Structures are given as structure tokens and as C-alpha cells.
A protein has these predicted regions:
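Membrane-interface helix termini and inter-helical loops of multi-pass transporters
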Residues: 1-3, 55-68, 116-121, 146-149, ...
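Structural motif at transmembrane-helix junctions in multi-pass transporters
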Residues: 31-37, 82-102, 184-190
Length: 212
């Protein structure tokens, strides 16, 4: 197997594991912060952590690519993650992560449509399984002993809408960043830092105004 493919698979699995653990951790935190505010706090902390990377970015040489990455962060991190946190609050980790599994499916459609990528039979079978699991999860009710769940139909429907919006924003943001990364002039770490900055620019002005 190609070495780069192995690295890509390991990175994807590590990212999924990190998302699952962080989602469970967030569900266990008792807080009055809204999803937008919590995401803003997360972005601020992460941006400060990667601040040294931002200082050495090739701003003058890669202006277009960096602006594209900032737009990617605004869509995928500021909007997408806020929708994701809002869905977690209403539906819980299991249902939200199941719907989140639509992400690779939508990304595959994007690659096939705009990047002329070829989707093999195994990938299509996997896509069908994912779509089926999402449909099943969408019609399930949260467990009776689920702490903090709102079992009302309106809340569950809103949670489903938030989860789907999070997937769409996440895939859209990833698609924008992938166009830049394919050029090979900006490293993944630099890409993560500039995307966080883009998310920060969008989310900060609305921290006290967004109530979901």
C-alpha cells in the first residue's frame, strides 16, 4: 500500500477518534454557554495555540490561497462546528455522529462532480450503508434515561436540521481547503491555523447575539 495512503487513513481515523472523544466530553460538561459561544471559546483557545504558525505564513506570496482557507474556516469551523454543537445538545452524541457520517458521502459526490474522481463499487456500497444508518438514526428517539435531552418532536427536528447543516458546512469548508492543499504550497498545519483564524473572524462579532 502506498505510504501516503497509509498516512491519510491513520490521520482520518485519528481525527474521527478525536471528534468522538471531544463530543462525549462536551456532552458531559454542564454549561450555560450556547453552542455558538462554546465554539467561539474553542476557536479562541485553538487559535492562540497555533498563533506562532500564523506569524510565519506566506501572506504576500499565497494571498489567494490563504483567503480561500479563511473562507473555508468561516464556513466549516465557525458555522459547521456551531451547528454540530447545537445538534449534540438536542440529539446526543450517537445520533449526531451517525448523521455526521454523511460527510464522506457528500465529499465523494463533490470529488466525482468537480474533481473528476472515480468512485468504485465498494465505495458506493459503503455510501449506501451510511445513508441507511443515517435514515435509521434520524427516526430514532433518544434513550429515556438520556440526561439533558429534549424529547419533544420540534427539538429533535431542529437537532436533525442542525446536524445536516453542520455536515454541509463541514464538507463545503473541507472542499475549499482541499483545493489549496492540492497545490502543495501550504502545509496541513498552516492550513489548520489559517482556517481557525477565518473562523475566529466570523464568530467573534456574533458571540453575544446568537442564542442557539
Amino acid at each position: 500500500m502506498n505510504h501516503s495512503i497509509v498516512i491519510g487513513v491513520l490521520a482520518a481515523l485519528s481525527g474521527s477518534l478525536a471528534w468522538t472523544l471531544s463530543s462525549s466530553l462536551w456532552r458531559s460538561i454542564k454549561t450555560s454557554l450556547t453552542a455558538w459561544q462554546l465554539n467561539g471559546l474553542k476557536i479562541v483557545i485553538a487559535t492562540l495555540f497555533l498563533c506562532p504558525v500564523l506569524l510565519f505564513l506566506p501572506w504576500s506570496e499565497q494571498t489567494n490561497g490563504l483567503m480561500l482557507l479563511m473562507a473555508s474556516g468561516a464556513i466549516g469551523i465557525a458555522l459547521g462546528d456551531s451547528f454540530y454543537f447545537a445538534a449534540l445538545r438536542r440529539q446526543g452524541t450517537r445520533r449526531t455522529l451517525t448523521i455526521e457520517a454523511l460527510g464522506p458521502l457528500l465529499a465523494s459526490f463533490y470529488g466525482m462532480t468537480f474533481l473528476a474522481e472515480i468512485i468504485n463499487l465498494k465505495s458506493w456500497l459503503g455510501a449506501i450503508l451510511v445513508a441507511t444508518s443515517v435514515v435509521i438514526a434520524a427516526f430514532q428517539q433518544p434513550p429515556e434515561n438520556g440526561v439533558g435531552f429534549n424529547r419533544q418532536f420540534s427539538s429533535q427536528r431542529l437537532g436533525l436540521l442542525f446536524a445536516l447543516s453542520g455536515v454541509i458546512c463541514g464538507v463545503s469548508g473541507a472542499a475549499l481547503s482541499r483545493q489549496v492543499l492540492l497545490l502543495g504550497q501550504i502545509t496541513p498545519l498552516q492550513s489548520a491555523a489559517i482556517r481557525l483564524l477565518g473562523g475566529l473572524v466570523l464568530i467573534i462579532p456574533w458571540l453575544s447575539k446568537c442564542a442557539y
